[in-house]
């Protein structure tokens, strides 16, 4: 099967999310109605979202930032939980995965897992509750 052919979200991990959210609001991009102070999301063109995630919340949910972490994550959003499970099985077979969650997990936002590439770049594979993937593979944040 392989992984779905898409990058649907770029997430910037922010030391001062209030300051960065104010900066990005100046772009005039539509902000998701489900944004909260610690996780602000802007809908971009072609089904891609820009997410701002507070450093504190990131560390609480995904672990301490490691040296060399560049302050962003790449995310592949999936149509459903079953696709997340199949993607996890695929990534488990990759050579050189630096770190991989043992299994996908559920949380208040959805279902997914994370892994790091050989240079420490963080990837997420997720099904976000209420999201949609259109016929082109474009992602719409709820």
What is the predicted role of each segment?
Residues 2-4, 34, 65-68, 105:
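A generic structural micro-feature
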Residues 1-21, 74-76, 128-142:
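N-terminal beta-strand motif that seeds the catalytic metal site of vicinal oxygen chelate
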Residues 57-63, 133-135:
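A short, acidic/glycine-rich surface segment
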Residues 3, 6-15, 42-43, 63-142:
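Vicinal oxygen chelate
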Residues 21-22, 85, 123:
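Alpha-helical elements of the RecA-like P-loop NTPase motor core of helicases
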Residues 11-57:
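Core segments of cupin and vicinal oxygen chelate
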């Amino acid at each position: 099967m392989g992984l779905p052919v898409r990058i649907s979200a770029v997430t910037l991990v922010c030391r001062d999310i209030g300051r960065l959210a104010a900066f990005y609001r100046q772009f005039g991009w539509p902000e998701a109605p489900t944004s909260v102070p610690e996780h602000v999301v802007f809908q971009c063109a072609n089904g891609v979202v820009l997410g701002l995630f507070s450093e504190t919340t990131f560390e609480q949910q995904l672990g301490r930032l490691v040296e060399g972490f560049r302050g962003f994550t790449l995310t592949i959003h999936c149509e459903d939980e079953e696709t997340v499970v199949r993607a996890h099985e695929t990534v488990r077979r990759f050579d050189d995965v630096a770190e991989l969650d043992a299994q996908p997990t559920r949380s208040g936002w959805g279902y997914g897992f994370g892994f790091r590439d050989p240079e420490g770049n963080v990837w997420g594979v997720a099904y976000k509750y209420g999201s949609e993937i259109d016929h082109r593979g474009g992602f719409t944040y709820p």
